[in-house]
A protein has these predicted regions:
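Short glycine-enriched, charge-decorated loop/helix-capping segments at active-site entrances
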Residues: 48-54
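Small/aliphatic-rich secondary-structure junction motif
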Residues: 1-48, 132-135, 142-192, 264, ...
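Short, surface-exposed alpha-helical segments at coil->helix boundaries
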Residues: 54-65, 116-119, 191-199, 252-255
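Long, contiguous binding/interaction regions
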Residues: 125-128, 261-264
Length: 279
């Protein structure tokens, strides 16, 4: 039984990488796949805290595993790796003892990994066959649409979940939903509440058949949204709030500020008090 280590970050859904995985699975259905996602910062934009970077990488792992299970019937092991892709890959080699490595990068003109001679270094250090797959997701796109969902108290409301379910069933591309839950403060209790809100959302969303993963984020919802827009290639944004009489986000004009910060369409979903109380 062969074991293949797949190393990728932003290109994890790229067409050429998916084909490389599919080819190996068709040649040998017993092949095991391990996905390693180094937790790398975006090159431009705001400074992003390490915890957010780690969570973003974990979201990529979670969504890759779920998408490949649903679309390709593959059960894949995944992990977040060291920020340095060479170290992350060598750590995964020691942990999983693969027979082959597939590394997916952006084209040479935009790939920081290639500027560091990653492919040659891995081949020399590991002694394993290393296939380099180039995925130009900026021109090719992805086989799914990524929807960024920003919510907190309304994250598991009926209104939001119905909106996402309708979007997922629109008959077009598969939708992957990334929910971001901003903290309500900087204390430990706020972290626990945000994680509880995330857990409740994930339970309900997955029960509804949605392909989704999520993370907690900066207490400022605008910064949380901007950070997520830097980390992920987002096709749509959904912002869920309470009504205008109760929503601090609306008083801060959050929806319009996000619209000005991205070219992606931004939708606003309002949950009623009763929905929120029952969620």
């Amino acid at each position: 039984m062969a074991r293949v280590l797949v190393v990728a970050n932003e290109t994890i859904g790229g067409k050429n990488l998916i084909e490389a995985v599919r080819k190996r699975a068709e040649q040998d259905p017993e092949t095991e796949f391990v996905v390693c996602v180094p937790r790398t910062n975006p090159r431009d934009g705001n400074i992003i805290y390490d915890d957010f970077v780690f969570q973003a990488a974990q979201v990529r792992v979670d969504l890759a595993r779920k998408w490949m299970r649903e679309q390709m019937g593959l059960e894949i092991v995944g992990e977040v790796g060291d920020p340095d892709p060479y170290t992350a890959t060598m750590d995964a080699i020691r942990e999983y003892a693969p027979d082959e490595i597939v590394v997916s990068t952006k084209p040479v003109t935009t790939s920081g990994w290639l500027r560091r001679d990653l492919i040659e270094r891995l081949s020399d250090a590991s002694g394993l066959p290393v296939e380099h797959v180039v995925s130009d997701i900026d021109s090719e796109g992805l086989p799914f649409d990524v929807v960024l969902v920003l919510a907190n108290r309304t994250a598991s409301s009926d209104r939001l979940l119905e909106h996402l379910r309708t979007k997922a069933n629109d008959g077009g591309k598969t939708h992957l939903f990334i929910v971001v839950i901003p903290l309500e403060g900087g204390q430990g209790v706020h972290v626990n509440r945000a994680r509880a809100a995330l857990g409740q959302y994930l339970d309900r969303a997955r029960a509804a058949g949605l392909l989704t993963a999520g993370m907690v984020a900066d207490p400022d919802p605008f910064i949380a949204a901007k950070n997520a827009l830097q980390m992920f290639r987002v096709d749509e944004v959904v912002v869920s709030t309470l009504g205008p009489e109760r929503s601090g986000w609306l008083r801060a004009d959050l929806v319009e500020r996000i619209r000005k910060a991205t070219d992606a369409p931004v939708e606003h979903v309002v949950a009623t008090d009763r929905e929120t109380a029952n969620a």
